[in-house]
């Protein structure tokens, strides 16, 4: 994992396995099934880093030889919140890593004319004492990510409780996001070159939602 000189609160997960799988996802010939499976695998691998600083507690257990106070994390103190619909598959990967975590949902779609997010669903677990991992494959303009964090704030979640995880990010999106929420760390597998006039990340991987679900 490395940082970026222009974005001090951006963390790029450059593990070889993550980069290898991301390259396969970028390939336009990748099938829907293959694209979906790769995203789930990358999310699980990214989850290892994004949960690195989860606090541990102890639990008394019995091994075959003795009793001990064993270090454990409290999965119920973690909430995974995908931005629908594309974030759902990333959430699946994270839930394999921490199956006891709670799951919320924020439904947004991007207006094709204004490029701004439109909200249609919000379902969240109790925020008290809980860390929230907000997930979306693409951090493009940054507008949806900012809106989603605003939704969490509106429901009692502080910026200090939030981590944002994206498969691929554009510099424009990172700037927009951190202009609004400078203390929320962003974790990504790839910081790409730029946005094109249609607000797609270049080189990117196309429309993640359409490629995940086989729609147009």
From Swiss-Prot:
GO terms for molecular function: GTP binding; magnesium ion binding; uracil phosphoribosyltransferase activity. Its EC number is 2.4.2.9. PANTHER family: ADENINE PHOSPHORIBOSYLTRANSFERASE, URACIL PHOSPHORIBOSYLTRANSFERASE, CHLOROPLASTIC. It holds the Pfam family UPRTase. It is an enzyme of class 2 (transferase). Pathway: Pyrimidine metabolism; UMP biosynthesis via salvage pathway; UMP from uracil: step 1/1. It comes from Rhodospirillum centenum (strain ATCC 51521 / SW). Belongs to the UPRTase family. It catalyses: UMP + diphosphate = 5-phospho-alpha-D-ribose 1-diphosphate + uracil. It comes from the Bacteria. Catalyzes the conversion of uracil and 5-phospho-alpha-D-ribose 1-diphosphate (PRPP) to UMP and diphosphate. This is Uracil phosphoribosyltransferase. Gene3D superfamilies: 3.40.50.2020. Binds 1 Mg(2+) ion per subunit. The magnesium is bound as Mg-PRPP. 5-phospho-alpha-D-ribose 1-diphosphate binds at residues 85, 110, 136-144, 207. Allosterically activated by GTP. GO terms for biological process: UMP salvage; uracil salvage. Uracil binds at residues 201, 206-208.
